Each structure stands twice: as structure tokens, then as C-alpha cells.
């Protein structure tokens, strides 16, 4: 019988056909657009973390709430928790010190300096994929142990801050003196979708160091925080692990000394867990049944907890005092001879064959063990460069303590951006080069000063294109992930930014603005650069018949060259900036995807990205002065011409060569080439979502709205690093 007959019969019985059958009709079920078109442009990445997902609302002020926190009482509660062993997850040696250090470490350790994404700054360990990564087994228990404290203090302390503070308190409770703690990490309420964790489809897929160099992600295997502790691809070879260790720690901005200190310091306390084979371990939190309530990795081996716990599958205790800080890691590393063995779970590890039984059992005081080490621990002894550092730390424990304190602080604060974002009573006074330090302000320009400066800029002979371009070049280095870059500091005038190809305009424009700064001595160069953009946009809007005052907030300062880490700032150089029609390499993603990436780093929404590109094109801000995307006969006028001409069916677009990167727009009737464009231009007509936005600004009644929206988005970018205004 046909489907039609089936439906007819159902209707004739009075039953609704849509209530029959077993198909999943819930929202979001079924085949999605990305199933049909897997290469679909990810415009949705620009819609993350909106107020619609934030239960606290847009008026919530975390810094204000934190100021109400009884910080001393919170630390006291955390200290008490460390020895309050719970039967559902008993503490090793009666202390959660090692567990909380690992939780903080693995939260921060996803950071990578190449794009500033990852890290502990938003409490992402609560969400997939990190909450269910193979390397994060049992950290769900650490977070549940913290819940009563989070519940007690509520919104006065974010999860993101609490995770790191718990690690700090654990170190302090072990007798270690930390470098300090800066709060200020604000929670988000959904997983980050923009972080590229890699292309692998299976957990623990090995990445060769050469591949890591081309795509510097945070780990050497999918699902790990750093490296495989059994060596690359479970090789069991300490020496072969050296390259992987350097690659992954280097991708976080760590040098060899910091790397050695972090590995040794992290392995001075606690243990790994590998009581039996991984086959006993159940589903991770995301895959666990609903009754598990977000807990995962339930073990069927013995009690499943305590002495029977399975986490990494390795069963290693490094030191004689696993809950107290010591130099035993290095002492044991060099004192004993190590032989390869296997854990009860079958994982490769090393045992000190000539050592007495000096390691306490975590649950039976009558038992002792020989010292054990991970494959990657022995790398610190057998790699020549790591060995030099390790022996120095062996012979100078104070140097080790200082190095670890600083490296731990860097690890846990690396993605927070400038020190101006830190809050709390334990913020260190010392400025550190990786914080991109800035000097104290020298100027407090008045409104009259600003008016006079604008007049001087307007009379300088600079074009609208030059003024707008130099301001964008200065501000657009900002990265929302780790809050680095931006206009404050005027680092556009310093190495390495002044020498980037994309910033060619700086060589022409900065000398003019520097002369104005010296002559007037009323504002910083950083402020004058941004003010030049203000002048350019106001002139362009006036030429379009719209009188508008572009908001300007003075107060920026000028960084010195010695406050600028050239190597680390080199990572901010864009491989593409679609706002300026710039692309340095064609072997990395598509031009339009890189435009989305840039917009996401600038925390822009899709409408903001759209209006900025359209406005910058008609203002002639292409990095090389080309006419690509300049769809107007009146450049320098802040018009909607980009959108109107892009969507005009009078033109037909065709690629100029097989690269499909550059296109010609020809008149359909005459065949005459009217415009040229890149993929960063044409995407606003080809992508259905972006075309819908472009159509808004192409309408005849959109001109005033366009100018206002452009100015609002522009000011947002100029002030992204003005944390003093936020």
C-alpha cells in the first residue's frame, strides 16, 4: 500500500500521522546543512557567547562581584577541601593536592600562542570536548569536589578563576611559595566552537613534530593536553620524546627552562592512576547515561576508586613526599638507573631498578614502592639540553623553585592578556615581558587638545585612506582569545609590526603622525594614530552627506621596544586580513574562512564584519592600494556602493586564473571589466547568510544606518584593548 494510503487510513481513524512512527522529530535532529555542505562557511562562529546564552545577563559585572568576595575565607575553604577525602572519590594519601594541580594545569595547558585560543580564561574545561578528553579522565571528579565551594560563593568567583586558584592553593598547601594569582577570568556558558583542535577523527592520533610546526596546535596527539607520556606514538623512547615536548611547550610560548620546570614541578606532587586495563573504564562524561549526571569514566574494576582507580593507565608515583613540595623528582631522576616496565594497565613506564622501596602507598601505610617515572620524565635526563637544566635544578633547588613559580604563573595566566585585567589581592607587582607591559600615561589630553590635534591631522596632507588604514593597522592585531595586540602601546611603530608587509602604509603615515605628536606634545602616538582614523571617517561620512562625530576615548600610552617581545609579537602577524584584502599564503584554508577567523579574533559579529568590510572597501584601505573590492566611482566617500554594486545583476563575475583568488566583474552587455575582487569581497554575495546582511546595506534607505553601524563597529575595534574602559 502506498504512503498516501497509509496516511489516509491513519486520518480516517482520527489519529494524527505526525504522532506515529519512531522518527526523531526534536529540534536540531535530522540531516543538517553541514551534512550536505561540509565546507560551508562558518559564519556561525561569529555568534558565540552572546547574551542569549548568558544566564547572568549583560548587566552582570564580574569585577564588581569579585570585589565583594571574602578572598581569605575562600582560600581557607579550598585548603580545608584538600584533606576532606570523600568516599565517592577518595583522596590519595588523604590529599587532593595532586588532583587540583592537574585540574588547573590541564585547564590552562590548552593555550597555544599561535592564535591565542585555548587556555583557562573562560572555564572551558566544563564543556565538551575538554570535559571528555582522554587526557582529562577523572577531572570531572575534581570539579564536583569544588562544587560546594562554588555554590557557597556564587557569582563572586567564576569557575574559570576557581579552577586556577584551587591549583594555586594546592601548591601552597604542599609547602610551595607561588608567584601570585590574578583573578579576572569570566565564565562563558557554552563550548568554544572556534578552537581548531586538529583534523584527526580518532582520539590519541599521533602528530609528527613536522606537522605540528606547520599547524602549531596545543598537543602532539588528539585528546592530549601536551605529549603522550609513553613517548611519541607509545614508542617508550625518552629521547624521541624531546622533539614533541619542545614542540608542544614551545607552541605555548615556553622555553626549555620553563618546560623542564613545569614538567618536574607538576610531577613533584601526586600520582598517575592505572590499576587495571582501560577496558574497565566506561563512557566519558559527554557519552555517559543521563543518570550519571555529567560524571564519566565509571570503572568496573574493583571499587573503581581509590586504589582501584584508572585514569591514564599509568601507575607512577615520582617522589617520597607526594603531598609535600621537595626536590626529590630531580634527586630520584639522576640517582637511580631506570628500566622500562609496564603498569598494571599495560602502559609503558620506567622503574628505578636499584632503588629501595621508599615511595608510600596512597592508601596502605604499611606498603612501599620503588620510584617510578614516565617515559617523558626521563627525557629531562637523557636529552642533552634538558639534562643541563635538570642538573642545575638538582644542585640548586631554590633556582628550581623560582623557575617553577614563574613558569606556573605564566602557564595559568598566559591567556589573560595585559596585567590591567588582573584583579585580587595577590597580583604580583613585577611586570613580565609576556604580559606585554605598558608604561604609565604621560598625557591627559583635554577636549580642546583633541580638537586641535584633529585639526593638525586634517591639515597634514594625509588622505582618508591613509588615516583610516593606519588606525586599522594599529588596532586590528587584537586577539580575543588571549587579549593580546590592539592599538594601546602604538606598537605599530616598533619592531616587528612596523616591518610587516600588511602594514606598508605605516612607513608613509607614521612619520607624519609622529611629527604631530612631537610638535604638540599633548597626546601619545597611540592616541594620535586612532584619532587619525576618527578624522578620516568623519571626513568620509561628511563627503557622503552624513554629519557624525566618531567617539574617541583618549588615554592610550606608547610602549617601548624593550617592553615588546619581538618573537611573541611576530605571532600576531596575520597570514590574512580580509578587511584589508591581504593574504600572505595560499596553503592555509580559504580566503573567506580566514576572514571569518580574523573577525572572530576581533570579537565581531557577522553584521559588524559585514559593515566594516563594506566601509573599508569604499575608503580604499587595501593594504597594497589595489582596487580589488573597491566597487565605487567615488573612493573616500563612506557610501553603500560596495553592497549596491556587488549585488547588481548588471555584472558577471569570473576568475582571472585557476587559483580562483582574483575575479573580474564584467558588464553583462558590453563585456567591459568594471571591477576586480577577491574571495573576501565576493563572499558577501555568494554566502547566503552574508548576502542577507549585505542586502540590508544595499537598500536605498540604508545609508544613514550604514554610517552609524560602521562607526559603532569601528569604535569597538579601536577600543578592544582598552580594558580601563570596560
UniProtKB/Swiss-Prot annotation:
<dbReference type="InterPro" id="IPR000763">
    <property type="entry name" value="Catalase_peroxidase"/>
</dbReference>
<dbReference type="GO" id="GO:0020037">
    <property type="term" value="F:heme binding"/>
</dbReference>
<feature type="cross-link" description="Tryptophyl-tyrosyl-methioninium (Trp-Tyr) (with M-252)">
    <location>
        <begin position="105"/>
        <end position="226"/>
    </location>
</feature>
<keyword id="KW-0349">Heme</keyword>
<feature type="active site" description="Proton acceptor">
    <location>
        <position position="106"/>
    </location>
</feature>
<feature type="region of interest" description="Disordered">
    <location>
        <begin position="1"/>
        <end position="33"/>
    </location>
</feature>
<dbReference type="GO" id="GO:0005829">
    <property type="term" value="C:cytosol"/>
</dbReference>
<keyword id="KW-0408">Iron</keyword>
<feature type="cross-link" description="Tryptophyl-tyrosyl-methioninium (Tyr-Met) (with W-105)">
    <location>
        <begin position="226"/>
        <end position="252"/>
    </location>
</feature>
<comment type="function">
    <text>Bifunctional enzyme with both catalase and broad-spectrum peroxidase activity.</text>
</comment>
<dbReference type="InterPro" id="IPR002016">
    <property type="entry name" value="Haem_peroxidase"/>
</dbReference>
<dbReference type="GO" id="GO:0042744">
    <property type="term" value="P:hydrogen peroxide catabolic process"/>
</dbReference>
<comment type="subunit">
    <text>Homodimer or homotetramer.</text>
</comment>
<dbReference type="GO" id="GO:0004096">
    <property type="term" value="F:catalase activity"/>
</dbReference>
<dbReference type="InterPro" id="IPR019793">
    <property type="entry name" value="Peroxidases_heam-ligand_BS"/>
</dbReference>
<keyword id="KW-0560">Oxidoreductase</keyword>
<dbReference type="InterPro" id="IPR010255">
    <property type="entry name" value="Haem_peroxidase_sf"/>
</dbReference>
<comment type="similarity">
    <text>Belongs to the peroxidase family. Peroxidase/catalase subfamily.</text>
</comment>
<dbReference type="GO" id="GO:0070301">
    <property type="term" value="P:cellular response to hydrogen peroxide"/>
</dbReference>
<feature type="site" description="Transition state stabilizer">
    <location>
        <position position="102"/>
    </location>
</feature>
<feature type="binding site" description="axial binding residue">
    <location>
        <position position="267"/>
    </location>
    <ligand>
        <name>heme b</name>
    </ligand>
</feature>
<dbReference type="GO" id="GO:0046872">
    <property type="term" value="F:metal ion binding"/>
</dbReference>
<dbReference type="InterPro" id="IPR019794">
    <property type="entry name" value="Peroxidases_AS"/>
</dbReference>
<keyword id="KW-0376">Hydrogen peroxide</keyword>
<dbReference type="Pfam" id="PF00141">
    <property type="entry name" value="peroxidase"/>
</dbReference>
<protein>
    <recommendedName>
        <fullName>Catalase-peroxidase</fullName>
        <ecNumber>1.11.1.21</ecNumber>
    </recommendedName>
</protein>
<keyword id="KW-0575">Peroxidase</keyword>
<keyword id="KW-0479">Metal-binding</keyword>
